[in-house]
Every structure is written in structure tokens, then in C-alpha cells.
Amino acid sequence: ANMQVLSTSKSGTSLNAQSVSGKGLDLRTISPDNIESMEVIRGIPSVEYGNLTSGAVIIKTRSGVTPLEVKLKADPFSKMAYAGKGFLISEKMGAMNISADYSQSYADIRKRYNGFDRITVNLGYSNTFMKSSRPLTFNMRLAYYQNINSEKTDPQLKQDEKIKNENMGVRFNLEGNWRLNTSWISSLGYSFMVNYSHQQDYRREQIILQSGITPVANSYVSGEYQTYFLSSSYYSDYTVDGKPLDVFGQLKANKLFQFSSDCFMTLKAGIEWKYNVNRGDGMMFDPKLPPVVNDIQSIRPRSFKSVPAINTLSFFIEDKAQLPIRKTTLTLQGGVRLSNLFIDKSAGRKDMFMVEPRINMEYNILNGDNNKVFDDLSIVGGFGIAAKAPTLLYLYPDK
């Protein structure tokens, strides 16, 4: 739901290097020292994962009991300070994990006004209920992040030019697994996430028109209108105010059929829902002093509140089987993912329905049990379709 751009109807160019609009999650809001594990899924992923094109990266932050850690780092491009600890409340009450960090980075040290300064505070709680019967794992994480030193200036900037970037947000995650071990279901996994932030980018810059005095159009509908002319040089003040809200929920069930120690089959089925909306004031500037002007099209102020929310509902089912063939092993995995993107009628088009079948095969020929040279030699192949839905940035462009 990040829409921090000058115009969604033109190139979608971001306001400056601070924005990741249309590019996915801003990894700068995640503390690297608070990461517990990182899984890279290459090739054709499971149908459990959707809205992607080539693989996925699964990041899990720390939880449970961890020793006290204090870290300091400095190099020409970045500075970082981190402190964190996880402690056990009690055997019944579970464990708590607390951490905080500060980070400063420059993609280009020659452009200090494009630097990034942020603080992050993380709070995590984990516990396992009903340990002796049907264990239910519960992991809750709450993160707060905020930019500091948001107002930037630099001797390289022209006189009276200013840059200001503000980003403050809260991220809540809840996930776990319930081992039911019944005749029809082995385990039930759940995941829920809410991410809300307030982003505000302000810039004052000098606009110089190479074509000299230029007419500007500011109407929202086609037709003939009286307009005005811009001078060849002027200062433009513009602000992009965004309040993106992203909600994600997933529920999946697993059933394990164990035929022998090395022969089994696992069935997986689940449902997933995503909701994306932006309630910011959007692009704000004086129409008589626009930040971008050309002979073809000019941009206009637009509130993000006028952009409808996106709802995506998905279902998936998958079967994975491992079959021993003498001293070799054949693993087959196949499934399908069905997704429907609900589009508002104002977009002038119907909902988007996506079908994503995926198949993977791995035949392990050599291993430590049948030879003394190779630890692992396998033939891997597969076929799959992955669909990535358009974001709010591109689905509802301004007129």
C-alpha cells in the first residue's frame, strides 16, 4: 500500500531515493541483528506462497530465551548500535524478547541528503500451551520503527531547497502451530500480520523550464479550458502524505500419512486473505507551481483516500510424497493455488482470477548410504506458474 510517488499515472517515479513504493517490503525497517533465521526459496516454491515471481525470502525474527547482546558497527557507509535480550518469565508464562537498535546508512556518501536514519524497538512473546496433550505454539511480535533526523540539507543543494522524509510505523505479527494429531488432521498452522505506517515526504526545489514560459493544464476532465503560464524558473513545494495499512491472515492444515520410516505423504490445504489500503492525504502542492511539467502531461494533486482498498482471497492445496526406491529416494510435490483479486468497479474492469499450478520432482541418486564418494547427487525438475498482482500504485492511476 506504499504510494510515495510523484504521480501514479505517469512513470511511477518515487519522490526520492527514500521510497520503496511498488518494490515490496522496506527491509530497512527490520533490524538485521534481530533476525533468527532467513530461508531462501529458489526455483518453484510451494503453493503456500503467493504473489511472487521468482522464489521467496522467509525472514523470522528472534523469540524465546537469548543471551544479552550489545553490538556496535561503523564503516564509511553505515553506523549501527544494537542491544537485545530474551528471558524466561516462567515455565507456564513463557518467554519474552526485547531489543532496540539505531541505524544510519548512506547508499552514496556524496549525497548526504539521501541518508537513512532510523530507530527500531522490538518486543516478542512466545509460549507453548497444552504441552502434554496437543501442543499449541504461540509467537507474538510487535515492532515500532521511526526515522529520525528526517529533515535533510546539503551544501550540494541549491539555495532554499529542502528535503524532509518522515516514516513512523508499527508492525504486529502472530503465528503458531497446533499439533492436533487427529485421524483427519495432524497440525493446524496460523499466521496473522498487521503493518501500519505514516509516511510524509516533503521537498522544496527549484524548477527550471528549458522551454521557457510554458502553459500548464490543471483540469481533471477533458475539454477546453483557460489556463495560465509558468515562468521559466520558480520554486515548487510539494508533499506526499501516505498512511498505508497492510493486513495478512493465513490458516493451513496438514495431514501426515507415515507408511514407514522413509516413506510418507503429506497433504496441505489452506486459505489466505490480504487487505491493502492507503488513507493518506496523498500528493499536495500548489497547482500553479507544479513539481513536474512537460509538453505532454502534468500531474495534479490527489488524495490517496480516493483509492479503493485491495482485497485478495486465496485457496491452496498440495500433496508431497517421498518414496524409497532401493537405496535411492524419489520426492514428488504438486499443488495448485487459486487467487481472486477483488477490484473496485471504478477501475472499469472485472476482478482478477489467478490459477497457479506447481509441480516439483527430486530424484536422489547417490547419497552416503549407497556410495563413499558423493554425499548427495540428485536430479531436480519442475513446472510452475506464479502470478504477481498489481499494487495500489498501479491498479488505480490518477486521471
Q: Where would I find each of the regions flagged by the language model?
A:
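Extracytoplasmic loops and strand-loop junctions of Gram-negative outer membrane beta-barrel proteins
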Residues: 19-23, 40-41, 65-68, 104-109, ...
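Structural signature of Gram-negative outer-membrane beta-barrels, strongest in the C-terminal barrel
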Residues: 303-399
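N-terminal periplasmic accessory domains that precede
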Residues: 1, 24-28, 48-72, 87
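Transmembrane beta-strands of outer-membrane beta-barrel pores
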Residues: 74-78, 102-106, 142-148, 194-202, ...
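Face-selective signature of the C-terminal outer-membrane beta-barrel domain
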Residues: 129-145, 165-348
